[in-house]
């Protein structure tokens, strides 16, 4: 299962009661963070989650409201006695940008391993996370992310016996290991059926609606998408500033066939997003106005 927390929902600047947009997930003891604006570490503390377990930090782009909180977070992670390396993922220029921010956090008790995304779409596997970065349409290079948790096929004892797999290897093979024993190589597909549907989360902020968002979000269990503007009369602002309205995000969710939509990254002038949800739900009924620390646990389909 995948624990998901929308740490903040504000765009451009933090507001009283609304931190800057960021997402955190937990999976098998490993945490992943997408974006880290001013105050993100406070939002993590308010949620009661730990800095220590953050193994992966992804950045959508390098505007200040998405990255300015990184030095403080890194210092807090160091103070939490973290020593394991942290993987940092982001668009081209990642190491240069992070190095500049680290002027105030030059010494850390852990390494930063940088993965710069340069292609329109790239897949990165870290721990049990399958991370897919995809280019979106903002006024700087910007990426959305899908986070997938793969699920193995069902264990089929008859298949294991037919393939003469020793019983003592069954457990390790079910965990995805490949084992060499007595001059034979045993692989998971010798005891498992077809791969089952896993968990899929899609996160997209700072973009105009583009086809690749629909493509990447297809069938997501949860789609977290920016809704900078709820007011229909601000459609021109959305176009000019390369953002989205609630209604454009809802249309993306509808076309992608997602199960649930959470809106986020609200304009500072948008103080009551719930007032615009009635018309949003007319487009996509399972749309919800994101709130700081809104959380859910996504689980595997028990019928699979």
Curated annotation (Swiss-Prot):
Stated role: Zinc phosphodiesterase, which displays some tRNA 3'-processing endonuclease activity. Probably involved in tRNA maturation, by removing a 3'-trailer from precursor tRNA.
Query: Which EC numbers characterise this protein's activity in its record?
Result: 3.1.26.11
Give the residues the record marks as binding Zn(2+) 2: 65-66, 206, 265
Question: Which EC class, in a word?
Answer: hydrolase
Q: Please give the InterPro entries that the UniProt record associates with this protein.
A: Metallo-B-lactamas, RibonucZ/Hydroxyglut_hydro, RNase_Z/BN
Describe the family membership recorded for this protein in Swiss-Prot or TrEMBL: Belongs to the RNase Z family.
Q: Name one GO molecular function term.
A: zinc ion binding
Keyword set, alphabetical order: Endonuclease, Hydrolase, Metal-binding, Nuclease, tRNA processing, Zinc
Quaternary structure and partners? Homodimer.
Query: Which co-factor is required?
Result: Zn(2+)
Give the reaction(s) catalysed. Endonucleolytic cleavage of RNA, removing extra 3' nucleotides from tRNA precursor, generating 3' termini of tRNAs. A 3'-hydroxy group is left at the tRNA terminus and a 5'-phosphoryl group is left at the trailer molecule
Active site, per annotation? 65
Q: One short Pfam family name for this protein?
A: Lactamase_B
**Name listed for the protein in its UniProt record:** Ribonuclease Z
Corresponding gene? rnz
Q: Where is the signal peptide?
A: none
- UniProt xrefs under PANTHER family: ZINC PHOSPHODIESTERASE ELAC PROTEIN 1 (PTHR46018:SF2)
Q: How is the cofactor bound?
A: Binds 2 Zn(2+) ions.
Superkingdom assignment: Bacteria
Chain sites annotated for binding Zn(2+) 1: 61, 63, 138, 206
């Amino acid at each position: 299962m995948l624990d998901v927390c929308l740490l903040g929902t504000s765009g451009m600047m933090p507001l009283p009661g609304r931190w800057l947009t960021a997402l955190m997930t937990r999976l098998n003891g490993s945490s992943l963070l997408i974006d880290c604006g001013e105050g993100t570490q406070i939002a993590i503390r308010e949620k009661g989650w730990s800095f220590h377990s953050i193994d992966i930090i992804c950045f959508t782009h390098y505007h200040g409201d998405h990255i300015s909180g990184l030095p403080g977070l890194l210092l807090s992670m160091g103070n939490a006695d973290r020593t394991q390396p942290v993987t940092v993922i982001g668009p081209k220029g990642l190491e240069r940008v992070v190095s500049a921010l680290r002027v105030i956090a030059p010494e850390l008790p852990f390494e930063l391993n940088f993965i710069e995304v340069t292609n329109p779409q790239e897949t990165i596997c870290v721990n049990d996370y399958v991370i897919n970065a995809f280019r979106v349409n903002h006024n700087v290079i910007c990426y959305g992310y899908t986070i997938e948790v793969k699920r193995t096929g069902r264990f089929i004892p008859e298949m294991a016996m037919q393939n003469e797999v020793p019983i003592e290897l069954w457990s390790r093979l079910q965990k995805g290991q490949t084992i060499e024993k007595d001059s034979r190589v045993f692989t998971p597909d010798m005891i498992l059926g077809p791969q089952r549907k896993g968990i899929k989360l899609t996160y997209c902020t700072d973009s105009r609606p583009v086809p690749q968002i629909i493509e990447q979000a297809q069938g997501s269990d949860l789609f977290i998408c920016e809704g900078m503007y709820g007011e229909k009369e601000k459609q021109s602002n959305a176009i000019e500033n390369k953002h989205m309205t609630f209604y454009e995000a809802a249309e993306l969710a509808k076309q992608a066939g997602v199960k649930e939509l959470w809106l986020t990254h609200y304009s500072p002038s948008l103080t009551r997003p719930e007032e615009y949800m009635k018309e949003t739900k007319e487009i996509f009924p399972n749309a919800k106005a994101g709130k700081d620390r809104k959380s859910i646990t996504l689980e595997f389909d028990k019928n699979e």
